[in-house]
Regions:
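Membrane-embedded translocation segments of transport machinery
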Residues: 207-226, 231-322
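Hydrophobic, membrane-inserted alpha-helices
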Residues: 94-99, 246-250, 313-317, 342-350
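Juxtamembrane non-transmembrane "cap" segments at the membrane-aqueous interface
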Residues: 58-63, 270-282, 372-396
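Interfacial loop/helix-cap signal at membrane boundaries in integral membrane proteins
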Residues: 58-82, 86-98, 140, 240, ...
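A cytosolic-side transmembrane-helix exit/cap motif
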Residues: 133-140, 240, 283-286, 352-356, ...
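Signature of multi-pass transmembrane helix bundles
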Residues: 1-41, 46, 52-55, 71-72, ...
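Short, amphipathic, aromatic/basic-enriched membrane-interface segments that mark the entry/exit
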Residues: 11, 15, 81-86, 330-337, ...
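Hydrophobic alpha-helical bundle architecture
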Residues: 103-107, 297-304, 316-387, 402-415
Length: 475
């Protein structure tokens, strides 16, 4: 049974869904995330396996001394990392292609050409043209300049802009280009010729913008955008209120597809000085008592607020597996379980999805705050020691406090309580998601939403009145 509050929240959520699912942009976003999912699953599995099993500082690599009995372990890890670069680190460009492609269908444009021009524009904007156009420069720029799932907003923005620019240029070109009198006269060649002008304009503008971005010294358009919203160094004080606020800002950026200032893979970078002093005192005294900095970003956020990645994603994955009544949700949850245990949350971001999903935005923002509060209280009152020793970036988040305090059981218990607190935050929202799904099945939602819930979208995408080629793909 659902409580009155859950029914009220479900009604509000369904109202929001009713509004946004009529928007072409939202339809294209959902289709884009669905099409990205297989690549994200493969890339995340490769990352999780390579970095936890075949890399020198990996969790399983260190525990089972894999390098001693498998000399080729690091070579295997490098190959798997390279394969993951082709999938995960190219998500921005794939997102630009797919988003532009689906938008083009909705606008009755040539979806294949529009998708390709958007992807090329995204690649051009990520390359530093002033550094010299070489194979090495282009390759490193595309794989290392924030092209992953966590910056998918950049790809969507480029895809949207490229589509609208193509649409406008195509309208201008239609005033002087000869259009076929009948649809039978339209061929691949004529459609390609009509696309020369809009494609040229979009790519030329992308090159010009890339040159301007290169002058700023930033790593592509994604780097410039992240730099423009970055917090100043002085903002990272170690008061618990500041930690909470920066965590909230970080996760707000995450749900719209941008990297925030915090990451489980950047431990000790925000508070490296404080962590170093804590470690020095602990090594000198042989005790974790009377440390100079008990509350820092590392001892609170990394340890208690980022289990499974930002947003306490591990708690969401476990809650989905246990409580969701939607088969697709549970399947994605099982796929996401191992990578999330190793702190890779890309599958959850794209598959549930968390990105741009009204139902999961609120708990994604609240769960880390609640979990950090649970961890901060015993830490503040001296009931548990702070984490001092280096831990595995790819280890299960709920073991970080235990390992980082050299096996303190009170720290482990606090981690478990923090995890359960995050889990409880997600539970009512999963129940609301179940209720919305049940109403979809019983036909209480409009037909358009029922079709959208299937994530196929074929019926939602209007067909061309007289297509020259009777296929959904154009090239």
């Amino acid at each position: 049974m659902f409580s009155p509050l859950e029914n009220w929240l479900a009604a509000r959520y369904l109202h929001i869904q009713t509004v946004i699912r009529k928007k072409k942009v939202y339809i294209a976003v959902t289709h884009t995330l669905g099409s990205l999912l297989p690549f994200v699953i493969i890339g995340s599995m490769l990352q999780a396996v390579s970095r936890s099993i075949f890399m020198q500082n990996g969790f399983f690599y260190s525990i089972y001394h894999i390098g001693e009995w498998l000399p080729a372990a690091r070579s295997i890890g490098q190959v798997m990392n390279a394969l993951s670069d082709i999938t995960i680190n190219f998500s921005l460009f794939l997102g630009a292609f797919l988003f532009a492609k689906y938008l083009a269908r909705l606008y009755n444009l040539n979806d294949g050409i529009v998708g390709w021009v958007a992807m090329l524009a995204a690649m051009i904007l990520q390359v530093n043209l002033l550094a010299g156009v070489s194979r090495i420069n282009i390759g490193s720029s595309l794989t290392n300049n924030g092209g992953g799932v966590h910056n998918i907003f950049v790809g969507l923005l480029v895809g949207l802009t490229a589509t609208q620019a193509y649409r406008g240029c195509a309208w201008i070109a239609s005033h002087w280009q000869h259009a076929p009198a009948t649809w039978q006269e339209e061929t691949f060649v004529t459609r390609g010729l009509h696309a020369v002008f809009p494609v040229s304009v979009v790519l030329a503008v992308a090159v010009g913008l890339s040159l301007l971005i290169s002058l700023t010294g930033q790593n592509g358009f994604a780097g410039l955008l992240l730099y423009s919203i970055a917090l100043p160094r002085w903002a990272f004080s170690h008061a618990i209120v500041t930690i909470m606020l920066i965590t909230l800002w970080n996760n707000v950026l995450n749900v719209v597809g941008l990297s925030g200032p915090l990451s489980p893979f950047s431990q000790l970078t925000v508070d490296s000085t404080q962590s170093s002093k804590n470690l020095t005192v602990a090594l000198k005294t042989g005790s974790l008592n009377n440390l100079p900095y008990r509350v820092t970003f590392h001892t609170v956020y990394d340890v208690y607020g980022a289990m499974g990645g930002n947003g306490m994603t591990l708690a969401l994955v476990v809650a989905i597996i246990l409580l969701s009544r939607q088969p697709d949700r549970r399947k994605v949850g099982w796929w996401a379980l191992f990578p999330t245990l190793m702190n890779f949350n890309d599958i959850a971001l794209v598959g549930f999805p968390i990105l741009f999903n009204p139902i999961y935005i609120v708990p994604y923002l609240l769960a880390p705050l609640v979990s950090m509060t649970v961890g901060w209280m015993p830490l503040h009152f001296g009931w548990v020691p702070p984490v001092v020793y280096n831990t595995f970036n790819t280890g299960p988040g709920f073991l970080t406090a235990f390992l980082g305090t050299n096996g303190n059981w009170a720290a482990l218990l606090t981690s478990v309580l923090a995890f359960l607190a995050g889990l409880l935050v997600y539970v009512p929202f999963i129940r609301i998601d179940n209720l919305a799904w049940l109403q979809t099945l019983t036909g209480e939602l409009p037909t358009q939403q029922q079709e959208e819930a299937k994530l196929s979208g074929e019926e939602l995408i209007p067909a061309r009145p007289h297509p020259a080629i009777k296929k959904t793909e154009s090239y």
